[in-house]
Amino acid sequence: MNINVNIKNIIIDKPLKLDCGQTINNYSLAYETYGSLNENKDNAILIFHALTGDQFVSGINPITKKEGWWSYAVGSGKAIDTDKYFVICANVIGGCMGSYGPSEINPDTNKKYGTTFPVITINDMVNAQFNLLNFFNIEKLFAVMGGSMGGMQTLQFVNNFPDKAKVAIPIACTASHSAQNIAFNELGRQSIMADANWENGDYSNQNKNPNKGLSVARMAAHITYLSKNGLQEKFGRKLQERDDLKFGFDADFQIESYLRYQGSVFVDRFDANSYLYITRAMDYFDLVKEHHGNLSKAFEKTKTKFLIISFTSDWLYPTSENKEIVIALNAIGAEVGFVEIESDKGHDSFLLKVPKFLNTLGDYIKTAYSKN
């Protein structure tokens, strides 16, 4: 995958002290923008991407040649209207779309970092992306938002910078990664590390790729993004291009073929070590523990207005976990709205064309900006 094509990036020379104790300097942050920053510089929206996302939220991704991961929501006349708002999205540090990550060259060794790369956290990701405000000379964002891991970054941003966003929209997320989700992430990591081509994380320097392990990790994770009813309705027990069972271990069922396909295409656009590092960052995320068991304290200094959105069939970050955020905000008298969207598409609902979600998101943003 050639990531040197049409990538915008800034080199941040301000030292960043990571939660692991290391300090990084002169690191790259890849980003993309949509729309125009107005004269008052009050129409900027910072979008945080999820685990396997990147900075290309809309239009055509110049690397993969596919539509951006949130093209349903971001664009001219869409819920996040780029005719009105200036949208910024950066590839997180630890990622593999041009930002400082394990596939970058370590200047001290002239080799790719691999697993010598420092372990990073959601907090580190957010602190790195905060530099974008200075780069664009933006004093205060109109909004910060994101789904899944993007929602975690949204919460962390408000915690870290309580006066730097007027509106925050965390979608389908949590304030503390659950044991179940840590378990799923560990399954993926072990799949990668069990691949003989992983080479203790040094595979890139040896011209190898742990594609089998990464593919299985993606297959396992992808199941958690869907729902039981959605899977049953779409696939059921339908056979894959055959009239009867073959009594072997080929893909008899359509769902098997679908998962294998998802795994195979994923390895073409994602780095295995980045998968390890980013899932670890998600597992370490715990705003509740950070505030000694009182989530409300994460937001007590902010006047940011919140809209929390969850989905009925999301069992990865269920409505109950989203409501915990609402309860914490209510406890400090924050201005918070909450919407649970009916959908059978599971956790991935926020990435798909779910009209009620897109309408809710667009209406809220439009109303909030009119009061800006």
Curated annotation (Swiss-Prot):
Enzyme nomenclature, EC number: 2.3.1.31
Superkingdom classification of source: Bacteria
UniProt keyword terms in alphabetical order: Acyltransferase, Amino-acid biosynthesis, Cytoplasm, Methionine biosynthesis, Transferase
GO cellular component terms, semicolon-separated: cytoplasm
Family matches, as InterPro entries: AB_hydrolase_1 (IPR000073), AB_hydrolase_fold (IPR029058), HAT_MetX-like (IPR008220)
Main location, first listed in the record: cytoplasm
Active site, UniProt feature: 148 (nucleophile), 314, 347
Disulfide bonds: none
Gene Ontology biological process terms in this record: homoserine metabolic process; methionine biosynthetic process
Enzyme class: transferase
Residue sites binding substrate per the record: 218, 348
Domain AB hydrolase-1: start-end pairs: 43-353
This protein's record includes keyword Amino-acid biosynthesis: yes
Keyword Amino-acid biosynthesis: yes
Molecular functions per Gene Ontology: homoserine O-acetyltransferase activity
Subcellular location as annotated: Cytoplasm
Protein purpose: Transfers an acetyl group from acetyl-CoA to L-homoserine, forming acetyl-L-homoserine.
PANTHER family: HOMOSERINE O-ACETYLTRANSFERASE (PTHR32268:SF11)
Family affiliation: Belongs to the AB hydrolase superfamily. MetX family.
UniProt-listed NCBIfam families: homoserO_Ac_trn, PRK00175.1
Protein name (database record): Homoserine O-acetyltransferase
UniProt lineage: Bacteria, Pseudomonadati, Pseudomonadota, Alphaproteobacteria, Candidatus Pelagibacterales
